[in-house]
């Protein structure tokens, strides 16, 4: 089995795998569109848009990332689907593939992903990091048609009283 897509450690949802090296090479080269849902603290302004800021390592030895002018180009589209009690549900689409991209971009937007231990949302007290890869759409190299895989899981906006600050 060969991974075609990957997820950060605490992110959940769909991943794309290939059965062999040939299929892997074809799927890596194929056009893919990923969609994520995130429960975030706050309400992004504007409610939808494009985040286009570069991402770099926090320091040469660090695994963490930050927005910095000398970083690699990183672009993410976002749209607010719902807001309730100061928590927003965002639809996110990474247009580049940087490490921790969506988590860093949400933090830069001022709307940290709930339950994110590295980028400011850990104190939410909720049920883990609320970032889910809800779908991946890709052109199947053998079937010669577009396919979409959807997750049966999604982020949770149902927090007991007092758990979200």
Residue ranges, per PLM feature:
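RNA pseudouridine synthases
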Residues: 1-165
């Amino acid at each position: 089995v060969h991974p075609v897509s990957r997820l950060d450690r605490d992110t959940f949802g769909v991943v794309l795998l290939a059965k062999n090296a040939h299929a892997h090479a074809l799927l890596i080269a194929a056009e893919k569109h990923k969609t994520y849902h995130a429960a975030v603290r706050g309400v992004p302004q504007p409610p939808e848009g494009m985040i286009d800021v570069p991402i770099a390592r926090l320091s040469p030895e660090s695994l963490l990332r930050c927005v910095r002018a000398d970083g690699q180009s990183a672009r993410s589209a976002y749209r607010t689907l719902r807001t309730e009690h100061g928590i927003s549900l965002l639809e996110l689409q990474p247009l580049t593939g940087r490490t921790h991209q969506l988590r860093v971009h949400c933090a830069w937007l001022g709307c940290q992903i709930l339950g994110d231990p590295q980028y400011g949302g850990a104190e939410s007290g909720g049920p883990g990091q609320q970032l889910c890869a809800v779908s991946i759409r890709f052109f199947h190299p053998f079937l010669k048609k577009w396919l979409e895989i959807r997750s049966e899981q999604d982020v949770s906006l149902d927090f007991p009283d007092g758990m979200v600050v």
